[in-house]
Structure formats: structure tokens, C-alpha cells
């Protein structure tokens, strides 16, 4: 089962993913990304990756000098890959052996897609009919892979909105039990 969650920025995709991870417990393996905010000004300064193992690393920041930019955020692809690739490889191995495992990928977005290793691994995972995945994608097709995932045969595409975000969790958990 492939469950693809999309929606406008700030609608609650990552919050929903974290609730799914909490409910699935050890069945969930993967990562999510979240904003990094200045503790004093509360302004967003970057993004960090957090794995289901509890590892964290800032991979995108207004303070990074990089040729890879998304708006004013420099993206350090190596920092992202250091956490994302090992956890996704482990998740994929375990999910192939145990159908109850769920691979978590939040998000398949512009910053993450700078990594060719990530693109290749995500494509392999998403096209494997024998593994369960919960992934998030931007509302807009920011990359050909996002477009490909949005049109994946058999995948369930859910657009998260302010109207459904508080009631969709149980539906997603039910889909994963099939």
C-alpha cells in the first residue's frame, strides 16, 4: 500500500506523519523533516531531518553557503544523505521481509530531491508493490519524480486540508491494516 499525502505548505502534513509514526510504533521506519526556528525571533532559519531512530541533522539553512538553493535556504545534500539514505535502505530491507513495516518518507520535496541517491532509492521503493509506504509530496509537481509518484497506479493520494486534517488519521491507519 502506498499512501501519498499532499497539501499546501503549513497544512499539517508533517504533523500527520508524526501522528502516524506514533501510532505505528516500531512498525514505522523512515524520516520526516521539520522547520528550524530561531529561538528568539521565532523566524524560520532552516530545516532538519529527523529519523524514526531519533537521529537529527540540519540539512538546509539560511546560513549555509551552497549552490543548491530553495529560496534563501542553502541545502547541504551530504548532510541530508547521511541520515536519509541509511534509514531508507534499512526501512526498505525490513519492509521487504515484514509486510507490517511501513516506510515513512516526509518529504519528497525540492530540497530532498537535490540528492540523486534519494531520488533513485525513492523510485525503487515506490515502484515495489511488496512494501508499504506513507510519503508526503508538495501540492505542485516540483520535479518529474513528484509527478510520477502522484500518478502511481494503485497508490492512494490524499490531499490534506484544514477540513480533513483532524479526521484523516484513522482512515490512513485502516488502509495500512489491509
From Swiss-Prot:
Query: Which reaction is recorded as catalysed by this protein?
Result: a ribonucleoside 5'-triphosphate + H2O = a ribonucleoside 5'-diphosphate + phosphate + H(+)
Q: What InterPro entries would the database entry show?
A: AAA+_ATPase, Nuc-triphosphatase_THEP1, P-loop_NTPase
Which molecular function GO terms apply here?
ATP binding; ATP hydrolysis activity
Against CDD domains, the record matches this protein to: RecA-like_Thep1
The entry's keywords = ATP-binding, Hydrolase, Nucleotide-binding
Q: What is its EC number?
A: 3.6.1.15
Thermal dependence, as annotated? Optimum temperature is 70-80 degrees Celsius.
Q: What class of enzyme is it?
A: hydrolase
Q: Which Pfam families match?
A: NTPase_1
Positions binding ATP in this chain are 7-14, 102-109
Per the UniProt entry, the signal peptide is: none
Q: SMART domains in the record, alphabetically? A: AAA
Please give the SUPFAM superfamilies that the UniProt record associates with this protein. P-loop containing nucleoside triphosphate hydrolases
Under Gene3D superfamilies, the record lists: P-loop containing nucleotide triphosphate hydrolases
The UniProt similarity line reads: Belongs to the THEP1 NTPase family.
Q: How does it assemble?
A: Monomer.
What does it do?
A: Has nucleotide phosphatase activity towards ATP, GTP, CTP, TTP and UTP. May hydrolyze nucleoside diphosphates with lower efficiency. Does not have kinase activity.
Name of the protein: Nucleoside-triphosphatase THEP1
Top-level taxonomy: Bacteria, Pseudomonadati, Aquificota, Aquificia, Aquificales
